[in-house]
């Protein structure tokens, strides 16, 4: 665990996060995520998953699945190196150096080819590890996502000054609209059980309006306190009306 935490580099690739998913029944055949891990003799570890569907990946590969089906081949099960239900870049191979990581990945490729799996995928790989996959002939798929990065802004106005006039005007208008709704915000670092219950209600509603069940269980959120989570609630007329989860 200590080695894993030291080399993972972010909360979502950490042992604590992945283990919490496993221990709180977020990963099973019903969800389509079956947890596995390659522990190489050189000290490198690769957490990966046997996937029975493509749900919770945030990468849409249904066209590939249909193509496999048209040619009489099974696309599932497949193997995926990713963080379940979490589309963030991170280290997919946990090891001390690129040579060790490449050796471990080669072992996983061999395992895939010798088993019944259709393919091996690595999703949202951080930039520092992409060459390892390229050197082993992985096919790279490019897409776009959006991230906000704090470029040493001194204040919010300093951030706004970096935008063009149209975007700056629109953002100020949106913030003024929120102010006029008389919504207040509450930040909580010492999260209590009731806070998690309120948060999970909002989390569940987000899925329910789309006719889906939540990917994550309520017990999962209550088990990740060592990852330094922060909850922010929006209040209106003394009632919590929305919530957001952050990690430090």
Where are these regions (language model features)?
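N-acyltransferase acceptor-side catalytic subdomain
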Residues: 1-248
